[in-house]
């Protein structure tokens, strides 16, 4: 299976309507957003599906290394392999991907925010950064 097939399958199996909306985009944008969406699903699935928070934290640490490796030209995960050809064209920086990981990691540490600043930070990391990347891709 190619990295491109992997991210297509990941997006299709997610059950999200995003997958169908992406089908109407021009091919370069569709490929970029599908790869980015698959990356985000991978990260979110760690937090949602791994029961032991310490195991989830280890997996997220692995993803941090994978992001660094990918930007050094050494990606091993098909989601990153599918995403990397689009990073320069759409301004997708390692900091964007690391922010998504950081935001999802916050789910392991707390489920409720006691102040607006903490909530705003969480929302920025798990949704705002995703919107920034999507707007870069969509133009």
Model-derived features: where do they sit?
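Acidic catalytic motifs of isoprenoid enzymes
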Residues: 1-139
């Amino acid at each position: 299976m190619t990295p491109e097939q992997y991210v297509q399958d990941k997006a299709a199996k997610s059950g999200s309507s995003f997958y169908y909306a992406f089908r109407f985009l021009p091919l370069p944008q569709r490929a970029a957003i599908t790869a980015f969406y698959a990356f985000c699903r991978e990260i979110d699935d760690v937090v949602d599906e791994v029961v032991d928070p310490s195991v989830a934290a280890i997996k997220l640490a692995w993803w941090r290394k994978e992001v660094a490796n990918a930007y050094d030209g050494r990606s091993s995960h098909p989601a990153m392999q599918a995403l990397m050809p689009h990073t320069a064209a759409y301004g997708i920086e390692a900091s964007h991907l690391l922010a998504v990981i950081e935001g999802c990691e916050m789910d392991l540490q707390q489920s409720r925010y006691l102040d607006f600043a903490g909530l705003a930070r969480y929302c920025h990391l798990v949704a705002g950064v995703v919107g920034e990347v999507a707007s870069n891709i969509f133009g």
